[in-house]
């Protein structure tokens, strides 16, 4: 009778050991699978850690242009409105924590785009100054030239196809494709890519320059387009909209401006292309934020 008793005891002990081993293995699996912080280690490793994102601010400077781009601690300012807006621009930049400007871009030598640049150069250290020209008879641009000389800045004309990094974003020069006698068509045309999002800036480029960029096969696809020449009927043509396929457009113009910007023809084309439009004359300053996938817009006031 003693042998059966020993057998039942041995079976019970083996069963208990099996249960304990299973519990230990399960516990170890949970520990190493979840990680010490309780997160899911495989998913966390597969998800890239985002940077600070890209913020694009279309500043309301009346009848002019000024766009601030901030990405991962770096800053680019495209144009700087008219001279009368200089204090507004420099004050806004300081409010946004801007200490220096990595790239200052003058799309072309017209006062409503470069009028405030003299003050910007005086107020902030500028690392690189890009422009579509190095000299001009335009008085506002001549003041930019003198300010650049005082700051020991070289005005550089970037070539088509040139790229440079703005934090995690990439800026590509798409135009002008050649030299134009028309100052508007001489505008720098830039595409800014951040993750899967893209922004297109055309300055005051008109149909001829737009057509040459498209004929050259440049990639103009974008989520957000800044309408050319303040919404003039001579810019942001159907072909550009077809190739770019933007979801949003921002028009920078002054309320009740003497030019009638934005023109009805332009607004009609944007409607036909099913583009959501923001206007600085109606919405004030427009801010677009990108995390590399999603876009969000905030405006200073309701349109």
Language-model features and meaning:
Residues 2-303:
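Non-globular, low-confidence helical/coil segments that flank catalytic cores
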